[in-house]
UniProtKB/Swiss-Prot annotation:
The lineage of its organism: Bacteria, Pseudomonadati, Pseudomonadota, Gammaproteobacteria, Alteromonadales. It is found in: Cytoplasm. Transaldolase is important for the balance of metabolites in the pentose-phosphate pathway. It comes from the Bacteria. It catalyses: D-sedoheptulose 7-phosphate + D-glyceraldehyde 3-phosphate = D-erythrose 4-phosphate + beta-D-fructose 6-phosphate. PROSITE patterns: TRANSALDOLASE_1, TRANSALDOLASE_2. This is Transaldolase. It comes from Shewanella baltica (strain OS195). GO terms for molecular function: transaldolase activity. The active site is at 132 (schiff-base intermediate with substrate). Homodimer.
Protein backbone atom coordinates (compact mmCIF):
# COMPACT_ATOMS: atom_id res chain seq x y z
CA UNK A 1 0.00 0.00 0.00
CA UNK A 2 1.32 3.43 -0.96
CA UNK A 3 1.88 5.93 1.85
CA UNK A 4 -0.76 8.56 2.57
CA UNK A 5 1.11 11.33 0.75
CA UNK A 6 1.50 9.31 -2.46
CA UNK A 7 -2.20 8.38 -2.38
CA UNK A 8 -3.18 12.00 -1.79
CA UNK A 9 -1.19 13.05 -4.86
CA UNK A 10 -3.56 10.93 -6.99
CA UNK A 11 -6.46 13.27 -6.21
CA UNK A 12 -4.94 16.62 -5.24
CA UNK A 13 -1.97 18.71 -6.36
CA UNK A 14 0.42 18.89 -3.40
CA UNK A 15 2.21 22.17 -2.71
CA UNK A 16 5.03 22.67 -0.18
CA UNK A 17 4.35 25.49 2.28
CA UNK A 18 7.99 26.27 2.98
CA UNK A 19 11.09 28.10 1.85
CA UNK A 20 13.30 25.19 2.94
CA UNK A 21 14.95 23.71 -0.14
CA UNK A 22 15.87 20.44 1.61
CA UNK A 23 12.23 19.82 2.53
CA UNK A 24 11.17 20.51 -1.06
CA UNK A 25 13.76 18.04 -2.39
CA UNK A 26 12.48 15.40 0.01
CA UNK A 27 8.73 15.59 -0.72
CA UNK A 28 8.74 16.54 -4.43
CA UNK A 29 5.69 18.83 -4.49
CA UNK A 30 4.25 20.32 -7.67
CA UNK A 31 4.42 23.93 -6.45
CA UNK A 32 5.68 25.86 -3.43
CA UNK A 33 4.35 28.79 -1.42
CA UNK A 34 6.21 31.34 0.68
CA UNK A 35 5.11 34.20 2.91
CA UNK A 36 6.94 36.81 5.04
CA UNK A 37 7.15 34.40 8.00
CA UNK A 38 8.61 31.62 5.84
CA UNK A 39 11.09 34.00 4.17
CA UNK A 40 12.24 35.12 7.63
CA UNK A 41 12.69 31.48 8.64
CA UNK A 42 14.49 30.60 5.40
CA UNK A 43 16.82 33.59 5.75
CA UNK A 44 18.22 31.99 8.91
CA UNK A 45 19.24 28.79 7.09
CA UNK A 46 23.06 28.83 6.60
CA UNK A 47 22.79 27.54 3.01
CA UNK A 48 20.91 30.72 2.07
CA UNK A 49 23.70 33.09 3.14
CA UNK A 50 24.80 33.63 -0.47
CA UNK A 51 21.23 34.54 -1.49
CA UNK A 52 21.12 37.19 1.23
CA UNK A 53 24.54 38.55 0.24
CA UNK A 54 23.40 38.76 -3.37
CA UNK A 55 20.25 40.65 -2.35
CA UNK A 56 22.28 43.09 -0.24
CA UNK A 57 24.83 43.72 -3.01
CA UNK A 58 22.07 44.23 -5.58
CA UNK A 59 20.15 46.64 -3.33
CA UNK A 60 23.29 48.71 -2.73
CA UNK A 61 23.86 48.93 -6.49
CA UNK A 62 20.34 50.31 -7.03
CA UNK A 63 20.27 53.21 -4.57
CA UNK A 64 22.20 55.13 -1.91
CA UNK A 65 19.04 55.65 0.15
CA UNK A 66 18.87 53.20 3.08
CA UNK A 67 15.07 52.91 3.06
CA UNK A 68 15.10 52.11 -0.66
CA UNK A 69 17.96 49.64 -0.19
CA UNK A 70 15.97 47.87 2.51
CA UNK A 71 12.89 47.63 0.30
CA UNK A 72 14.97 46.37 -2.62
CA UNK A 73 16.95 43.85 -0.54
CA UNK A 74 13.75 42.42 0.94
CA UNK A 75 12.12 41.98 -2.48
CA UNK A 76 15.29 40.60 -4.06
CA UNK A 77 15.75 38.06 -1.25
CA UNK A 78 12.18 36.78 -1.66
CA UNK A 79 12.80 36.41 -5.40
CA UNK A 80 16.22 34.77 -4.89
CA UNK A 81 14.62 32.14 -2.63
CA UNK A 82 11.80 31.69 -5.14
CA UNK A 83 14.28 31.17 -7.99
CA UNK A 84 16.09 28.44 -6.02
CA UNK A 85 12.79 26.71 -5.23
CA UNK A 86 11.74 26.82 -8.90
CA UNK A 87 14.82 24.73 -9.75
CA UNK A 88 13.18 21.92 -7.77
CA UNK A 89 9.44 22.17 -8.51
CA UNK A 90 7.89 21.76 -11.97
CA UNK A 91 5.09 24.23 -11.24
CA UNK A 92 4.87 27.63 -9.61
CA UNK A 93 6.19 29.65 -6.69
CA UNK A 94 3.93 31.99 -4.70
CA UNK A 95 5.68 35.17 -3.55
CA UNK A 96 3.86 37.58 -1.25
CA UNK A 97 3.36 41.32 -1.49
CA UNK A 98 4.35 43.20 1.69
CA UNK A 99 1.46 42.77 4.17
CA UNK A 100 1.72 46.47 5.05
CA UNK A 101 0.25 47.19 1.60
CA UNK A 102 -2.88 45.12 2.30
CA UNK A 103 -5.17 48.17 2.17
CA UNK A 104 -3.47 49.93 -0.75
CA UNK A 105 -4.53 48.68 -4.18
CA UNK A 106 -2.16 50.83 -6.23
CA UNK A 107 0.91 50.11 -4.12
CA UNK A 108 0.08 46.38 -4.14
CA UNK A 109 -0.04 46.45 -7.94
CA UNK A 110 3.26 48.35 -8.08
CA UNK A 111 4.92 45.82 -5.75
CA UNK A 112 3.57 42.94 -7.85
CA UNK A 113 5.04 44.53 -10.99
CA UNK A 114 8.40 44.87 -9.23
CA UNK A 115 8.43 41.22 -8.12
CA UNK A 116 7.52 40.05 -11.64
CA UNK A 117 10.32 42.23 -13.06
CA UNK A 118 12.87 40.82 -10.60
CA UNK A 119 11.87 37.28 -11.52
CA UNK A 120 12.13 38.14 -15.23
CA UNK A 121 15.63 39.54 -14.70
CA UNK A 122 16.50 36.23 -13.02
CA UNK A 123 15.22 34.33 -16.07
CA UNK A 124 11.83 33.29 -14.65
CA UNK A 125 8.70 33.89 -16.71
CA UNK A 126 5.57 35.23 -15.01
CA UNK A 127 3.78 31.98 -15.93
CA UNK A 128 5.70 30.31 -13.09
CA UNK A 129 4.84 32.92 -10.46
CA UNK A 130 1.79 33.55 -8.31
CA UNK A 131 1.64 36.95 -6.62
CA UNK A 132 0.23 36.55 -3.11
CA UNK A 133 -2.10 39.25 -1.84
CA UNK A 134 -4.17 39.44 1.34
CA UNK A 135 -7.90 38.91 0.65
CA UNK A 136 -8.88 42.45 1.64
CA UNK A 137 -11.18 44.38 -0.69
CA UNK A 138 -8.13 46.32 -1.90
CA UNK A 139 -6.10 43.14 -2.39
CA UNK A 140 -8.92 41.56 -4.38
CA UNK A 141 -9.25 44.69 -6.56
CA UNK A 142 -5.48 44.65 -7.14
CA UNK A 143 -5.75 41.01 -8.21
CA UNK A 144 -8.51 41.87 -10.69
CA UNK A 145 -6.20 44.39 -12.40
CA UNK A 146 -3.16 42.09 -12.33
CA UNK A 147 -5.09 39.14 -13.76
CA UNK A 148 -6.13 41.34 -16.71
CA UNK A 149 -2.39 41.87 -17.35
CA UNK A 150 -1.74 38.13 -17.28
CA UNK A 151 -0.17 38.19 -13.81
CA UNK A 152 -1.74 35.35 -11.84
CA UNK A 153 -2.55 35.88 -8.18
CA UNK A 154 -2.88 33.80 -5.02
CA UNK A 155 -5.37 35.46 -2.64
CA UNK A 156 -4.29 34.53 0.86
CA UNK A 157 -5.44 35.08 4.46
CA UNK A 158 -8.88 33.93 3.35
CA UNK A 159 -11.27 33.01 6.17
CA UNK A 160 -14.79 33.70 4.92
CA UNK A 161 -17.23 32.85 2.17
CA UNK A 162 -17.56 36.56 1.30
CA UNK A 163 -13.81 36.76 0.60
CA UNK A 164 -13.93 33.57 -1.48
CA UNK A 165 -16.87 34.74 -3.57
CA UNK A 166 -15.32 38.18 -4.21
CA UNK A 167 -12.02 36.56 -5.26
CA UNK A 168 -13.74 34.32 -7.80
CA UNK A 169 -15.80 37.21 -9.15
CA UNK A 170 -12.56 39.20 -9.58
CA UNK A 171 -11.09 36.38 -11.68
CA UNK A 172 -8.34 35.47 -9.21
CA UNK A 173 -6.26 32.51 -10.36
CA UNK A 174 -6.13 30.87 -6.92
CA UNK A 175 -7.29 31.30 -3.31
CA UNK A 176 -5.72 30.01 -0.09
CA UNK A 177 -8.42 29.44 2.55
CA UNK A 178 -6.74 28.97 5.96
CA UNK A 179 -8.10 25.78 7.49
CA UNK A 180 -6.11 25.55 10.72
CA UNK A 181 -6.44 29.19 11.73
CA UNK A 182 -10.23 28.89 11.44
CA UNK A 183 -10.07 25.84 13.72
CA UNK A 184 -7.86 27.76 16.19
CA UNK A 185 -10.45 30.52 16.50
CA UNK A 186 -13.38 28.18 17.08
CA UNK A 187 -11.50 26.07 19.63
CA UNK A 188 -10.63 29.20 21.58
CA UNK A 189 -14.13 30.67 21.22
CA UNK A 190 -16.10 27.55 22.18
CA UNK A 191 -13.60 25.66 24.33
CA UNK A 192 -14.44 22.55 22.30
CA UNK A 193 -12.31 20.14 20.31
CA UNK A 194 -13.33 19.17 16.78
CA UNK A 195 -12.66 16.00 14.83
CA UNK A 196 -11.66 16.39 11.19
CA UNK A 197 -15.17 15.81 9.81
CA UNK A 198 -16.61 18.60 11.98
CA UNK A 199 -13.58 20.88 11.74
CA UNK A 200 -14.89 24.41 10.94
CA UNK A 201 -11.94 25.02 8.60
CA UNK A 202 -12.62 21.83 6.65
CA UNK A 203 -16.32 22.72 6.44
CA UNK A 204 -15.45 26.23 5.16
CA UNK A 205 -13.16 24.97 2.38
CA UNK A 206 -15.71 22.32 1.38
CA UNK A 207 -18.43 24.97 1.08
CA UNK A 208 -16.18 27.24 -1.01
CA UNK A 209 -15.06 24.36 -3.26
CA UNK A 210 -18.65 23.26 -3.91
CA UNK A 211 -19.81 26.83 -4.61
CA UNK A 212 -17.00 27.40 -7.12
CA UNK A 213 -17.67 24.18 -8.99
CA UNK A 214 -21.47 24.66 -9.00
CA UNK A 215 -21.13 28.22 -10.33
CA UNK A 216 -18.49 27.40 -12.92
CA UNK A 217 -15.70 29.51 -11.41
CA UNK A 218 -12.21 28.56 -12.59
CA UNK A 219 -10.44 29.96 -9.50
CA UNK A 220 -8.28 27.22 -7.95
CA UNK A 221 -9.03 26.30 -4.32
CA UNK A 222 -5.84 25.58 -2.37
CA UNK A 223 -6.45 24.68 1.27
CA UNK A 224 -3.70 26.05 3.56
CA UNK A 225 -2.63 26.35 7.20
CA UNK A 226 -3.21 22.84 8.50
CA UNK A 227 -3.02 21.70 12.13
CA UNK A 228 -3.15 17.92 11.59
CA UNK A 229 -3.26 15.33 8.82
CA UNK A 230 -6.93 14.63 9.57
CA UNK A 231 -7.85 18.00 8.06
CA UNK A 232 -5.78 17.20 4.97
CA UNK A 233 -7.32 13.75 4.51
CA UNK A 234 -10.83 15.25 4.76
CA UNK A 235 -9.96 17.63 1.90
CA UNK A 236 -8.63 14.96 -0.49
CA UNK A 237 -9.87 15.94 -3.94
CA UNK A 238 -9.46 19.69 -3.34
CA UNK A 239 -7.72 21.34 -6.31
CA UNK A 240 -4.53 21.90 -4.31
CA UNK A 241 -3.35 21.67 -0.72
CA UNK A 242 -0.30 23.54 0.56
CA UNK A 243 1.32 21.66 3.42
CA UNK A 244 4.24 22.40 5.74
CA UNK A 245 7.25 20.03 6.06
CA UNK A 246 6.24 18.45 9.40
CA UNK A 247 2.83 17.39 8.09
CA UNK A 248 4.30 16.29 4.75
CA UNK A 249 6.61 14.03 6.76
CA UNK A 250 3.71 12.68 8.81
CA UNK A 251 1.75 11.93 5.62
CA UNK A 252 4.78 10.22 4.06
CA UNK A 253 5.23 8.05 7.17
CA UNK A 254 1.59 6.97 7.48
CA UNK A 255 -0.63 4.59 5.55
CA UNK A 256 -4.22 5.80 5.64
CA UNK A 257 -6.54 4.66 2.86
CA UNK A 258 -7.40 7.85 0.92
CA UNK A 259 -10.64 8.42 -0.95
CA UNK A 260 -11.59 11.76 -2.54
CA UNK A 261 -13.89 13.73 -0.22
CA UNK A 262 -14.34 16.73 -2.52
CA UNK A 263 -15.76 15.95 -5.95
CA UNK A 264 -16.48 18.62 -8.57
CA UNK A 265 -20.12 19.18 -9.49
CA UNK A 266 -21.09 17.99 -12.97
CA UNK A 267 -23.80 20.61 -13.48
CA UNK A 268 -23.59 24.34 -12.87
CA UNK A 269 -26.08 26.96 -11.74
CA UNK A 270 -26.39 30.53 -12.98
CA UNK A 271 -23.97 33.05 -11.53
CA UNK A 272 -25.27 35.67 -9.11
CA UNK A 273 -24.68 39.40 -9.54
CA UNK A 274 -21.14 40.18 -8.29
CA UNK A 275 -20.74 41.51 -4.77
CA UNK A 276 -20.43 45.28 -4.50
CA UNK A 277 -17.83 46.75 -2.15
CA UNK A 278 -20.58 47.62 0.34
CA UNK A 279 -22.03 44.09 0.22
CA UNK A 280 -18.58 42.54 0.60
CA UNK A 281 -17.69 44.69 3.60
CA UNK A 282 -21.04 43.99 5.27
CA UNK A 283 -20.94 40.23 4.68
CA UNK A 284 -17.33 40.02 5.82
CA UNK A 285 -18.04 42.11 8.91
CA UNK A 286 -20.82 39.67 9.89
CA UNK A 287 -18.21 36.94 10.44
CA UNK A 288 -16.30 37.76 13.66
CA UNK A 289 -13.88 34.87 13.14
CA UNK A 290 -12.86 36.14 9.70
CA UNK A 291 -12.52 39.73 10.90
CA UNK A 292 -10.28 38.64 13.79
CA UNK A 293 -8.11 36.23 11.80
CA UNK A 294 -7.58 38.50 8.77
CA UNK A 295 -6.48 41.39 11.00
CA UNK A 296 -4.24 39.11 13.06
CA UNK A 297 -2.73 37.51 9.95
CA UNK A 298 -1.85 40.86 8.38
CA UNK A 299 -0.35 42.10 11.67
CA UNK A 300 1.76 38.96 12.14
CA UNK A 301 3.08 38.96 8.58
CA UNK A 302 3.97 42.65 9.02
CA UNK A 303 5.80 41.84 12.29
CA UNK A 304 7.86 39.14 10.57
CA UNK A 305 8.58 41.47 7.65
CA UNK A 306 9.87 43.95 10.22
CA UNK A 307 12.11 41.30 11.81
CA UNK A 308 13.52 40.44 8.39
CA UNK A 309 14.22 44.11 7.76
CA UNK A 310 16.09 44.43 11.08
CA UNK A 311 18.33 41.56 9.94
CA UNK A 312 18.82 43.09 6.49
CA UNK A 313 19.50 46.55 7.94
CA UNK A 314 22.41 45.15 9.93
CA UNK A 315 23.84 43.59 6.79
CA UNK A 316 23.33 46.75 4.73
CA UNK A 317 25.32 48.69 7.34
CA UNK A 318 28.39 46.47 6.85
Amino acid sequence: MANTLEQLKLYTTIVADTGDIEAIKRYQPEDATTNPSLILKAAQIPEYESLIDNAIDWAKSQSDDLAQQLDDASDKLAVNIGVEILKLVPGRISTEVDARLSFDKEQSIAKAHKLVRLYKEAGVDKSRILIKLASTWEGICAARELEKEGINCNLTLLFSFAQARACAEAGAYLISPFVGRILDWYKKDTGKDYDAVNDPGVISVTEIYNYYKQHGFNTVVMGASFRNIGEIIELAGCDRLTIGPSLLEELANSQVDITPKLVAATSTVAAEAPLTEAQFRWDFNQDPMAVDKLAEGIRNFAIDQGKLEVMLTAKLAN
